[in-house]
Amino acid sequence: MIRVAGLRKTYGGFPAVVGSDFEVSEGEIFGVVGPNGAGKTTTLKTLAGLIEPTEGTVEIGAYDAGDAEMRRHLGFLPEESPLYEDMTARSYLRFFADLYDVPREEATRRTEDTLDRLELEHRDRRLGDMSKGMKRKVAIARSLVNDPDLLIYDEPASGLDPLTTNYVLEFTRELAERGKTVVFSAHNLYHVESVCDRVVIMNRGEIVARGTVPEIREEHGETTYRVFATVPVEGSEATDDGRYLRTVGDMAAVEAVRVEAEFAGGGVADIRTDEPSLEDVFLDIAGRPPAAREDGRGRADSAAAARADGGREGERTDSGDDRGTW
Ligand SMILES: Nc1ncnc2c1ncn2[C@@H]1O[C@H](COP(=O)(O)OP(=O)(O)OP(=O)(O)O)[C@@H](O)[C@H]1O
């Protein structure tokens, strides 16, 4: 579906993406992960044809990215989605459906279905009066008005509460089940793990790890999850806000906590990726010089060097610019 070869993008000589190669198959959910400034948005915008590569090729099916015909098969959700504040959700979506020449009845059915699924209420409310989560849902519905084969979502759950985030992530999975290819970027490894088939981790414009999330974790370190249950579960500690915290090391254990909590008449209120673990994975990968990465050397050294440098364990200490900060 997508073939990226030797992709390089510079802004006035500044290398935002430096030689990316990856492929995404049809129906796959593909995550682009990395710290602020890693080059995720640049990569996604290049796939969407909104940015021209400085070097390299980006092919989407039979088209080059940027080909006008390709756009008809694409749904792009930018990180910040400015909406026309005076329009209602319905009129806004109808406006975009008209731009894509979608017949009225078909457009209404499609957008109402999407908004039902995302549980968006008040569809005739002004967009300017909607909450951030509601606006994000409208933006997601907009990305689907043309029934695209490929969806490119930049931080789809950015700034959303846990419940809305879950809707959005579950919905992303549903889209792939309906045969759509989804490429999305995120900071949160838990979000990525819950929906992505494969992932690339970027840092300073470079892909520094790739594979399924379990493959990456196995190779580069362990992530832990803090699961907040509404009832006591085995090994949990009560938190100040009346929840019960259990820290576990993998998704099977997260699922076991959820089942235990539900069996006890409660549920899971929130799940958080343990940040130091995430940073350990990142430091393990990104702290090594590129040459050492090639042959697997330098892994323990780089984390140790970061700590010896005076930083907290897992904290980056070398952010001389805006690149490479989680
Ligand atoms: N139009 C631009 N002009 C100059 N530099 C840019 C431009 N767009 C991005 N950059 C720089 O390129 C680098 C990569 O930016 P990009 O937005 O792709 O990163 P990102 O991984 O999406 O970051 P974030 O997580 O903060 O959104 C950053 O250092 C950024 O400052």
Language-model features, listed with the residues they occupy:
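Conserved ABC transporter NBD signature motif
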Residues: 56-66, 70
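Conserved catalytic motifs of ABC-family nucleotide-binding domains
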Residues: 147
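Catalytic Walker B motif of ABC-type/P-loop ATPase nucleotide-binding domains
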Residues: 151-155
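Short, charged/small-residue-rich alpha-helical element at the C-terminal edge
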Residues: 215, 221-289
